[in-house]
Amino acid sequence: MVEDQSRYLESNINHNELIKLVPFMSDLPEDSIHKIAAHFVTISHPSNQVLLLENDWGGSVYFILEGWVKIRTYNLDGKEVTLNILGRGEIFGEMAAMDKMPRSTDAITLTKTLIGRIPAEDFVNLIETEPMAGVHLVQLMAKRLRQVNRRLQLREASSISRVADAILFLVEGQGTEGDKGGTEIPNLPHREISSLSGLARETVTRVLTKLEKKGLIQRNADSMRIPDLPALEETIC
């Protein structure tokens, strides 16, 4: 299994403090945090590292401490389909832990990434014994269902709407305030926005150029800045 084959060393950072940086864990009682920390492992991965493979059995649940992770599958034609792009503070691998079924997707890093993980049985025990953890899990499932519904509703929308929605999707998960105002996200490769929006990469490139010319986005090598989020939202119809 991929999750057991990492060649990267465990970090020595204080695990209690790292766990509190994850929204899912942030307001749990201290005794629950201590129990999680006892089996919490942190591992650094380079970009394009496969973390999990579809049909693997779920031995761990993962928390992103730094970086970006793509959750993907493949359609019947063998084409890659990006289901989600997760960033700092987000969680993955929880479904296989809860239903004790093989994993339904792959997970691969998009950037240098620091991952924390706990054994699946510890996660399940946390959900069963800590009410707030159960509430957080329901909220997480509801959020992801809303995101899927939104993307399905836009399947027949214009290419500009779909690319704008993909950008806003990333902003919702990991947008940060820019040094010059506005909101910033990492400037991911066009192929990732292509897979997320369901459009050809060439189409995504053209749309991004149009959005940049209109002043709705600004790009450099590392980041994309959205000066006015409501203005970008207005392009979705």
What are these regions (language model features)?
Residues 1-47, 96-97, 129:
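Cyclic nucleotide-binding regulatory module and flanking cytosolic helices
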Residues 24, 49-112:
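Cyclic nucleotide-binding regulatory domains
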Residues 27, 85, 117, 187, ...:
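Short aromatic/basic micro-patch
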Residues 30, 66, 88, 112, ...:
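ATP/adenylate-binding site constellation spanning eukaryotic-like Ser/Thr protein kinases
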Residues 33, 84-142, 146:
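Cyclic-nucleotide recognition modules
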Residues 128-198:
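Polybasic "coupling" helices that flank or enter modular domains
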Residues 170-237:
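Phosphate-/nucleic-acid-contacting segments
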